[in-house]
A protein has these predicted regions:
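Rhodanese-like catalytic fold shared by cysteine-dependent sulfurtransferases
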Residues: 1-21, 27-59, 68-105
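Short, surface-exposed ligand- or partner-binding patches at beta-edge/loop junctions that are enriched
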Residues: 63-64
Protein backbone atom coordinates (compact mmCIF):
# COMPACT_ATOMS: atom_id res chain seq x y z
CA UNK A 1 0.00 0.00 0.00
CA UNK A 2 1.14 3.56 -0.67
CA UNK A 3 -0.29 7.00 -0.09
CA UNK A 4 0.58 10.67 -0.34
CA UNK A 5 1.48 12.81 2.65
CA UNK A 6 1.94 16.56 2.80
CA UNK A 7 5.16 18.24 3.87
CA UNK A 8 3.44 19.28 7.10
CA UNK A 9 2.46 15.66 7.78
CA UNK A 10 6.10 14.65 7.33
CA UNK A 11 7.05 17.36 9.83
CA UNK A 12 4.53 15.88 12.27
CA UNK A 13 5.95 12.35 11.77
CA UNK A 14 9.43 13.69 12.54
CA UNK A 15 8.23 15.67 15.57
CA UNK A 16 6.53 12.55 16.92
CA UNK A 17 9.67 10.48 16.22
CA UNK A 18 7.61 7.93 14.30
CA UNK A 19 9.38 4.81 13.13
CA UNK A 20 9.83 5.79 9.48
CA UNK A 21 12.61 5.16 6.99
CA UNK A 22 13.08 8.44 5.12
CA UNK A 23 14.56 8.19 1.61
CA UNK A 24 15.86 11.14 -0.43
CA UNK A 25 15.82 10.06 -4.08
CA UNK A 26 17.71 13.08 -5.43
CA UNK A 27 21.26 12.86 -6.77
CA UNK A 28 24.20 12.81 -4.35
CA UNK A 29 25.26 16.40 -5.02
CA UNK A 30 21.78 17.71 -4.23
CA UNK A 31 21.65 15.56 -1.09
CA UNK A 32 25.02 16.91 0.06
CA UNK A 33 23.89 20.49 -0.47
CA UNK A 34 20.95 19.91 1.85
CA UNK A 35 18.33 17.35 2.80
CA UNK A 36 15.76 16.53 5.45
CA UNK A 37 17.53 15.39 8.61
CA UNK A 38 17.46 11.62 9.05
CA UNK A 39 17.06 10.87 5.34
CA UNK A 40 19.10 8.20 3.58
CA UNK A 41 20.24 9.09 0.07
CA UNK A 42 19.14 6.53 -2.51
CA UNK A 43 19.18 8.19 -5.93
CA UNK A 44 16.59 6.83 -8.33
CA UNK A 45 19.17 4.88 -10.33
CA UNK A 46 20.38 3.10 -7.14
CA UNK A 47 17.07 2.53 -5.38
CA UNK A 48 16.21 -0.72 -7.15
CA UNK A 49 19.64 -2.20 -6.45
CA UNK A 50 19.34 -1.29 -2.77
CA UNK A 51 15.83 -2.44 -1.88
CA UNK A 52 17.25 -4.96 0.62
CA UNK A 53 18.24 -1.95 2.75
CA UNK A 54 14.58 -0.94 3.04
CA UNK A 55 12.91 -2.34 6.17
CA UNK A 56 9.65 -4.17 5.51
CA UNK A 57 8.55 -3.49 9.10
CA UNK A 58 8.62 0.33 8.87
CA UNK A 59 6.87 2.93 6.78
CA UNK A 60 9.13 4.01 3.91
CA UNK A 61 8.75 7.75 3.23
CA UNK A 62 10.09 8.89 -0.14
CA UNK A 63 10.80 12.32 -1.54
CA UNK A 64 12.54 13.71 -4.62
CA UNK A 65 12.73 17.24 -6.07
CA UNK A 66 9.06 17.86 -6.88
CA UNK A 67 7.29 14.52 -6.32
CA UNK A 68 6.70 12.62 -9.60
CA UNK A 69 9.73 10.32 -9.45
CA UNK A 70 9.19 9.37 -5.84
CA UNK A 71 5.48 8.79 -6.53
CA UNK A 72 6.32 6.27 -9.25
CA UNK A 73 8.83 4.59 -6.94
CA UNK A 74 6.24 4.49 -4.13
CA UNK A 75 3.80 2.63 -6.38
CA UNK A 76 6.45 0.10 -7.39
CA UNK A 77 7.67 -0.46 -3.82
CA UNK A 78 4.06 -0.96 -2.69
CA UNK A 79 3.68 -3.68 -5.35
CA UNK A 80 6.74 -5.32 -3.80
CA UNK A 81 5.02 -5.41 -0.40
CA UNK A 82 6.41 -2.30 1.29
CA UNK A 83 4.31 0.24 3.17
CA UNK A 84 5.16 3.53 1.47
CA UNK A 85 4.29 7.20 1.74
CA UNK A 86 5.33 9.82 -0.79
CA UNK A 87 5.82 13.48 0.15
CA UNK A 88 3.56 15.48 -2.15
CA UNK A 89 5.61 18.20 -3.83
CA UNK A 90 8.95 16.70 -2.80
CA UNK A 91 11.62 18.72 -1.05
CA UNK A 92 10.36 21.83 -2.84
CA UNK A 93 7.24 21.67 -0.67
CA UNK A 94 9.09 21.11 2.60
CA UNK A 95 9.80 24.25 4.63
CA UNK A 96 10.25 22.62 8.02
CA UNK A 97 12.85 22.77 10.73
CA UNK A 98 14.50 19.48 9.77
CA UNK A 99 16.29 20.82 6.68
CA UNK A 100 20.04 20.46 7.06
CA UNK A 101 20.70 23.41 4.72
CA UNK A 102 18.50 26.14 3.33
CA UNK A 103 19.98 25.93 -0.17
CA UNK A 104 18.50 22.53 -1.03
CA UNK A 105 15.51 23.95 -2.88
Amino acid sequence: MWYLISASELEQYLDEKREIFLVDMRDRESFRSGHIRGAVNMPEEELWERTKELPMSRLIVLYCYHGPRSMLAARQLARMGYQVADVYGGIQAYRGKYLTEKNCR
